[in-house]
């Protein structure tokens, strides 16, 4: 959405820290960035979702995909040029300036490499953080614990032993 183009001081827009603040600034609008994590929201920003049947029937393929994804993040952060060329090929509207901003923000905030990832590996998911996220959603009455059990919402089996360290 281009809500920022209206320059309404009461407008809000949800977005990615690596993208929307850059676009808003490029549009000449001064904006404040508020992080959900700063407000106590413990959930992971991005996870890999997969159907239960796929995990059961094609677990090796899922494991390979997860591993390649984590290694891809490590490679991208070490040398973004090859991936950026592919991004620009598929999205001709993408600029070098936007990509540089995104990589800088990823690194500055430790979005893929900070927190538990620094010692446990990129893409790590912990039981403690999954429980904190679940409890937050239960407390906010967004999940009914009688209908949704924590143990059925995630698995660490594909990431716990990967240790793709930054």
Give names to the regions the model predicted.
Residues 30-43:
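Short beta-strand->loop
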Residues 2-4:
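Short, small-residue-biased leader/transition segments that mark boundaries at the very start
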């Amino acid at each position: 959405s281009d809500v920022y183009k209206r320059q309404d001081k009461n407008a809000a827009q949800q977005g990615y820290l690596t993208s929307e603040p850059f676009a808003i600034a490029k549009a000449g609008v001064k904006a404040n960035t508020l992080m959900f994590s700063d407000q106590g929201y413990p959930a992971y920003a991005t996870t890999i979702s997969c159907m239960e049947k796929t995990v059961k029937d094609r677990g090796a393929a899922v494991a390979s995909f997860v591993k390649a994804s984590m290694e891809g993040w490590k490679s991208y952060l070490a040398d973004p040029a090859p991936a950026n060329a592919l991004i620009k090929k598929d999205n001709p509207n993408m600029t070098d300036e936007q990509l540089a901003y995104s990589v800088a923000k990823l690194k500055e905030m430790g979005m893929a490499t900070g927190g538990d990832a620094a010692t446990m590996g990129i893409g790590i998911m912990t039981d403690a953080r999954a429980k904190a996220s679940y409890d937050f959603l239960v407390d906010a009455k967004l999940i009914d614990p009688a209908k949704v059990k924590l143990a059925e919402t995630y698995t660490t089996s594909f990431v716990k032993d990967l240790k793709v360290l930054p």
